[in-house]
From Swiss-Prot:
Gene: ubiC
EC numbers: 4.1.3.40
Superkingdom to which the source organism belongs: Bacteria
Purpose: Removes the pyruvyl group from chorismate, with concomitant aromatization of the ring, to provide 4-hydroxybenzoate (4HB) for the ubiquinone pathway.
GO MF entry, a single one: chorismate lyase activity
Catalytic activity: chorismate = 4-hydroxybenzoate + pyruvate
Natural source organism: Burkholderia ambifaria (strain ATCC BAA-244 / DSM 16087 / CCUG 44356 / LMG 19182 / AMMD) (Burkholderia cepacia (strain AMMD))
Keyword Aminoacyl-tRNA synthetase among UniProt keywords: no
Protein name from the UniProt record: Probable chorismate pyruvate-lyase
One GO process term, biological-process aspect: pyruvate biosynthetic process
Family, similarity comment: Belongs to the UbiC family.
Alphabetical keyword list: Cytoplasm, Lyase, Pyruvate, Ubiquinone biosynthesis
PANTHER family for this protein: CHORISMATE PYRUVATE-LYASE (PTHR38683:SF1)
Location within or outside the cell: Cytoplasm
């Protein structure tokens, strides 16, 4: 894999291995390769709701991993992945604006189709190692995940993972924040659909 996510002081919360204190399910889902959408599909019927698509600046901990300037314009896509109608993951994808009109232009036309359709069907796409972190209030991802709960009380912390995809040398970063309903499902039903465990 050619692209490595780099770390500096602002990115200290992102780790190559999950933090101590993560449950076994959390460690598993934070480090699973392949398509998260495909993994969720084993639990039930997956739907994608787009909550935002816009040109915006990157979050404070994103530019270094994308080799970009702190205020460089980016194309941002935010979605909620639900299983059987219940939100399980809040996802934030970001690519340099030029890349969203070039190598990653198809991400602008996905609508409610999962980004995984682009990332795992093209042999020219490479993926970095996954990194993960605990997300608490103050990080923009916490606000995104809390909003996805649709009024339910947010936990003190979420866990999230992140990786960079490259296509023809242009980056696209995907950050996926797991929501409490995912962990409740795994506790009750294991790694399969409701009623299977």
């Amino acid at each position: 894999m050619s692209k490595r996510i780099r770390f500096d002081g602002a990115q200290a919360g992102w780790r190559a291995t999950p933090r101590p204190g993560c449950t076994l399910d959390q460690r598993d889902w934070l480090t699973r390769g392949g398509s998260l959408t495909a993994h969720l599909a084993r639990l039930g019927s997956v739907s994608v709701r787009v909550t935002r698509e816009a040109v915006d600046c990157p979050w404070f901990d994103e530019p270094d991993a994308l080799d970009s300037a702190p205020r460089a314009p980016m194309w941002v896509r935010e979605v909620i992945l639900s299983v059987d109608g219940t939100p399980y993951v809040a996802a934030h994808s970001i690519a340099p604006l030029a890349a969203s009109k070039g190598g990653w232009q198809a991400m602008r036309r996905l609508r409610t189709r999962p980004l995984a359709e682009l990332l795992y069907s093209d042999p020219q796409v490479e993926r970095s190692a996954l990194v993960s972190r605990r997300v608490i209030a103050g990080h923009p991802l916490y606000a995104l995940a809390s909003h996805a709960l649709q009024g339910a009380r947010a936990p003190h912390a979420f866990v999230a993972r992140r990786s960079v995809f490259q296509r023809h040398g242009t980056p696209l970063m995907v950050t996926e924040c797991m929501l409490p309903a995912l962990w409740r499902h795994l506790d009750a039903h294991g790694d399969g659909p409701r009623g299977a465990a």
